[in-house]
């Protein structure tokens, strides 16, 4: 009926996002999330993990934790177009990036943001969710490919411009937290020794690196916020890895440990 349709129309027309909309988008049976799970299972798993980290961290500073979790679920939907080019979806020993030049690799990475924003509009995701797609990398440098380009340049000048995400930098506490959770989750998967002290070291390093590079300058996060966010990340990751290490001889702990590599 018109009465039922009016709030939906108003929300879309005036770019207001209600908790009801966010709750609907947080349902893992949402068609877009089902599509992500089917086409890019590694990215889907990563996004759920980022959601858990972001929700806890946002709660610790009194932000909108539901918004942070939902934003995290959708931040990487653009990876569905070429899932095999992203490390979390790759089979062992198969990385199509190795066949590309560093510049081409950077274009593939850049494209997941553009494609994600396109899909957000196509599926009529609220603007506040679209912001997570644009802002979760800010203007950060794709350091691995930039260094590779420098090595191959034989001393010629290589501009870092084409190896940077276009931004904008995170504008809200929630998008800034998802940027941090995204980096921390990806780094935690590479840990050979996920001891509490190593996790603490990695989390603090990643948060510090983003802060010092200026990526958080446009967000309202304070230093006290960053300290609380860091603690929240550590608590969750230590809990996850503790469960995996606890039972060294059980098959479940082995498969869980393998899944982090």
What is each of the regions a protein language model found here?
Residues 211-261:
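Long, hydrophobic alpha-helical segments that serve as membrane-spanning/inserting helices
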Residues 10-13, 18, 161, 165-169, ...:
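Core, soluble structural subunits of large cytosolic macromolecular machines
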Residues 3-6:
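Short, small-residue-biased leader/transition segments that mark boundaries at the very start
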Residues 33-196, 200-203, 209-213:
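Divalent metal-dependent catalytic cores for phosphoryl transfer on phosphate-bearing substrates
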Residues 15, 19, 38, 134, ...:
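Generic surface-pattern signal
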Residues 9-51:
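Membrane-proximal helical linkers
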């Amino acid at each position: 009926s018109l009465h039922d349709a009016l709030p939906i129309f108003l929300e879309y027309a005036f770019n207001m996002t209600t908790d009801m909309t966010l709750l609907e988008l947080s349902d893992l049976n949402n068609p877009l999330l089902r599509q992500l799970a089917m086409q890019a299972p590694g990215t889907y798993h990563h996004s759920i993990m980022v959601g858990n980290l972001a929700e806890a961290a946002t709660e610790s500073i009194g932000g909108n934790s539901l918004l942070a979790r939902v934003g995290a679920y959708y931040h990487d939907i653009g990876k569905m177009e070429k899932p095999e080019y992203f490390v979390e979806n790759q089979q062992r020993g198969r990385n199509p990036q190795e066949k590309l030049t560093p510049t081409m690799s950077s274009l593939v990475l850049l494209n997941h943001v553009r494609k994600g924003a396109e899909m957000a509009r196509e599926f009529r995701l609220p603007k506040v969710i679209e912001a997570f797609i644009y802002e979760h990398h800010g203007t950060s440098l794709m350091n691995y490919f930039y260094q590779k380009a420098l090595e191959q340049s034989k001393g010629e000048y290589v501009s870092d411009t084409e190896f940077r995400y276009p931004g904008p930098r995170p504008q809200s506490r929630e998008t800034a937290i998802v940027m941090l959770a995204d980096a921390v989750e990806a780094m935690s998967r590479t840990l050979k020794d996920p001891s509490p002290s190593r996790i603490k070291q990695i989390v603090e390093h990643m948060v510090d690196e983003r802060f010092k590079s200026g990526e958080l300058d446009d967000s309202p996060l304070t230093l006290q916020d960053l300290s609380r966010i860091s603690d929240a990340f550590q608590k969750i990751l230590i809990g996850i890895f503790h469960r995996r290490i606890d039972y060294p001889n059980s098959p479940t702990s082995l498969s869980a440990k393998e899944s982090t590599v």
